[in-house]
Amino acid sequence: KEYGGFYTQDQIRDVINYAAERHITIIPEIDMPGHTRSMIAAYPHLSCFGEKTELCQFGGIFEKILCPGKDETFEFIEKLLTEVCALFPDDRFHIGGDEAPKTEWKKCPHCKARMEALGLTDYEDLQGYFTKRVVAILKKHGKRAVCWNDVLESKDVDTGNIIQYWTAQHEAPVPAFIERGGKVIFSNMSALYFDYPHGINSLNKVYHYQPVVMGKSYADSPNMLGYEAALWSEQVETPEHLEELLFPRLYAVSEIAWNEAGDYADFEHRAEKKIEIAAKQGVNCMTKDGWNPEGEARVQSAATFIAHMMNPGGIGTPHTDAEREMVRPVIEKFAQIWFRPQDVPEMMKNDDLVGAALNFMKMFPPENDETKGK
């Protein structure tokens, strides 16, 4: 039987040692209970209804997630984490917790029984229970959990967990968590997501990013651990494309993470020198004319990315009618997040996608970005 790519334990150790020699710490992430489609494709019984699920060939948010009502779910997680924790020396372990639709949980007899036994009425609190069970497993191995800020929708999240703030959709509970002493890493998608093109997250925007939640800055808070730029690879076609997305934006976030932002023109001048050196080493940096796209160039940069993400034929997107129907709720949700209500119907028509993107981006010129100039 053929399998996809994997690392042996010795290869993992080699990567960890290689990174450590360069003063880099590798922290593993196994996202759960959502973003587990591959896990469920291999072990269908871990989902609510145990239905066979094909391994998906494109990214998205899917309704089939791990079932917190089944004891075998936690038995599997314990075996998995026991093996993986032993490989990574750092005391932090990321368990995700983001984008976990409760659609199947609401129909699942196992979840219903679990909620009744625990006296729960809110499915977010069922995820909170799931998180606590996984955190308890990690603690047995001397690990501290890192979670996306979605998990704060459940009550009384342990401040021993580290929260990674990525989305304003679930920002309301973040200030209270910080006030209770909880530690937060800032990775706001509106500036620090580097799979987004420069037309969405420009170099200027990254350089002026501030850790603001609900209108309050946490730049001086002792509970703000720092920044982390994220780059998800579903839409990254080649190593050269990866490097173009990273540099010089990674220079910007490195500078502001260790210091306050200074004069942007001075930073740009230094960035030019850095990419000259990097280019001589074979690194494919974004050229200066692409750092801060304006006008139609900015709009086209963003529109191309969105069209690439959502249209059949793009990297990691559904190619058949059946696949497109399977991911349709994800596309509709994405459209509702990024577009005006009147654009959503047009989003579902392939030939009008870029037009809708153009209309949307024209509504938000760079000077209106919340992070610019702060």
Which residues does each predicted region cover?
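Long, low-complexity, intrinsically disordered segments
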Residues: F360-K374
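Flexible, acidic glycine-rich loops studded with aromatic residues
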Residues: R144-N161, T167-F364
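Intrinsically disordered, low-complexity regions of eukaryotic proteins
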Residues: A100-P101, E325, D369-K372
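Charged, low-complexity surface patches
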Residues: T8, Q127, Y165-W166, F267
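Substrate-binding cleft of carbohydrate-active enzyme catalytic domains
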Residues: K1-K143
